[in-house]
Amino acid sequence: MRSFLYMLSQRPKLACLCGKSIIIWPGKRTNLPENAFTQRMLQECGQMAKPDASVDLDNFKAISEQSPAEFGIDSCRVKAQPEDRSDRIREQIASAYPVIHERTLLLFISFLEHKLTFGSEQEKAIYKDMTVVDLVQRLLAKRCVWFFGANDYYRTMQGNIGNEGFEAVGTPAEKEPLTLTSVLSYDEIKLSALLYVSCHSEFINNGSRVNGGEVLQNKDTIEREGVVIGLIGARFERPDVMEYQDIMITKTQNTEANGYGFDLEQISSETVTPASDLRRIWREFYEEPRDFIYADTPYDTTRFEEVSQGIFDHQVMRKRYAISFDTLLLEAQDRAFKAGKPAYIHVVGIGLGVWKAARQQERTFLESFEGRLRALGERLSHIGVVHFSWFHLACVGSLHDGAIIPVDKHPQGGIRIRNSVRNPGDKLTEDMLPVVTYAWDGNALPGNEFWANMLISTGDPAAACSTLISELQNPHINVHYMNGANLHIASVEHGLLHVGDYARRLIV
């Protein structure tokens, strides 16, 4: 059961950033296991092919009309767009897919193996014979319509509305309507937070937080279309679940009974427990040799910060960000390369709003982003500008408005940095591909609060009101493209590949 992610990982390298030693992670290669379960999972991935279904726009609209989730407005739907945009919209529909980091693919495999061995009866029944592609499809399709707030206010796809109860999903204590057959468990939502969605889309307006779906008649002040990527930050609103398990160190959570405090060498087949094995797969995902009992946490102010709940681990937070940033940068690079023009990436602070849990979290975000820009280097030949919008810190490391991050062989010598307030759809002054990000959620459809008719609230509904993502990135509407079989993998070594192409490169 000992995972390849730890055993075969390369020794982490260090870089100096802001006077601190920052681990360069992940490395350029993710080594693969040779165990039979992983090889079988990759073999099954290798059988997948890109969808070749042609886009029938009338059928797409008909499926949307049957959606069990009600649209608050129609201006952001395909049916409301001008007829002369139909050909472009067909291309945008076909451009949609889910995307994960290559390390996340291997994490999903470890998760399935763990649950088949240590899962509850409910979990074993669900995961029996499940492939990675099946798991991704489940993470897309079984999420709620909306899911937000510290009390987990939700509406399921079946129309049930309520608060709380997700901690029991997948256990003998689960109750209708929150059962594993209908919704995701918190262990799955944690995985789902590493699963992102991407597509080209129309821009209806400038995408401001208060756009409310207004149809801008004068298109001269906005970009007509661009790439829209839903990223998900670390969520700390509920204790003892999600990234809280990996990044928060508390008296009640970080105990041996909950699987914490063990070195890998301490655990054997005789001493392993479901809790310690679940901690193992996450430690190995982040390539951390151990996680900490609260009382044994080392004194290291460059890594740890005291917060109201306990201790916040910035090293693991930085790694969590790195997975998101690698995926964003490699996805934007591929989209821009295919478009034949440099990408202008609009970056928002995922997890830095109501989910923010530490004073230094924004600094860690920006440090991690700079680290990944430098680490990916020559892979980012088609990244022209990275624009940080609505950040409080004007300068962290080399990231400040007007900076250039040097990149060998880059057509412009490097990647330009902007740090100022702008709207995602604002007109660019150069011929570049707009790539805009929005802060999504691991247990909601794209738009989240949008579906609760809260159109003017956060970046999630703002993105849904200003683009076509509520349909194009919706697995219940864009059924031929936004599905597990169309999963794409962002690889530091190989670039952006369909899961079938990626797996065929790796199969032993």
From Swiss-Prot:
One of its GO terms (molecular function) is ADP-ribosylarginine hydrolase activity. Keywords: Hydrolase. InterPro entries: MavL-like. It is an enzyme of class 3 (hydrolase). Its EC number is 3.2.2.19. ADP-D-ribose binds at R209, G349, G351, G353, V354, W355, W390, D441, N448, E449, G459, D460. It catalyses: N(omega)-(ADP-D-ribosyl)-L-arginyl-[protein] + H2O = ADP-D-ribose + L-arginyl-[protein]; N(omega)-(ADP-D-ribosyl)-L-arginine + H2O = ADP-D-ribose + L-arginine. Protein ADP-ribosyl hydrolase that specifically removes mono-ADP-ribosyl modifications from protein arginine residues. This is ADP-ribosylarginine hydrolase CG3568.
